[in-house]
């Protein structure tokens, strides 16, 4: 009833609990400096509340920032690091500045496929992964690839007769 029955809107802080024990937070619908700062703070706070899960920020470009685009992306990387985020995976030419600002623990990718492949290789229990970027960065495709990978793992586990398959 009411708020208890409310479902999050796709791409707006929607949480997915993956079979591997990863919490995937899909905030891929859009990004601007204010919403990104708030999402970083929410990720850091949720980690503290959940016993120190390893936190990952997967960031696509924030667009339409004009002459401030590079400094704002640098700030995003620095803010994520200062908030205690463990890793930053960045996609797109603007987000390269975020990776630079973050420093150790950051990687920059040129394609969605490269980023998704690298992230899938690192997924493990106790991770909280926030995906965020402007609509034009199409970060929802990263979320879709992670969810498809999780569904494929569930089907494989079910075929093997594993009890936990869902």
Where are these regions (language model features)?
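ATP-dependent carboxylate-amine ligase
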Residues: 1-166
């Amino acid at each position: 009833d009411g708020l208890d029955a409310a479902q999050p809107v796709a791409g707006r802080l929607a949480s997915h609990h993956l079979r591997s024990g990863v919490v995937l937070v899909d905030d891929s619908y859009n990004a601007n400096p204010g919403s990104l700062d708030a999402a970083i703070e929410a990720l850091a706070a949720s980690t503290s509340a959940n016993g120190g899960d390893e936190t990952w920020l997967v960031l696509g470009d924030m667009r339409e920032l004009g002459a401030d685009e590079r400094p704002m992306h640098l700030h995003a990387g620095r803010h994520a690091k200062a908030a205690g985020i463990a890793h930053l995976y960045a996609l797109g030419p603007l987000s390269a500045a975020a990776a630079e600002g973050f420093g150790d623990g950051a990687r920059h990718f040129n394609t969605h496929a490269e980023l998704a492949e690298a992230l899938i290789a690192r997924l493990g229990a106790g991770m909280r992964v926030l995906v965020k970027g402007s609509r034009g960065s199409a970060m929802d495709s990263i979320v879709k690839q992670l969810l498809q990978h999780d569904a494929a793992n569930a089907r494989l586990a079910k075929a093997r007769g594993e009890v936990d398959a869902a």
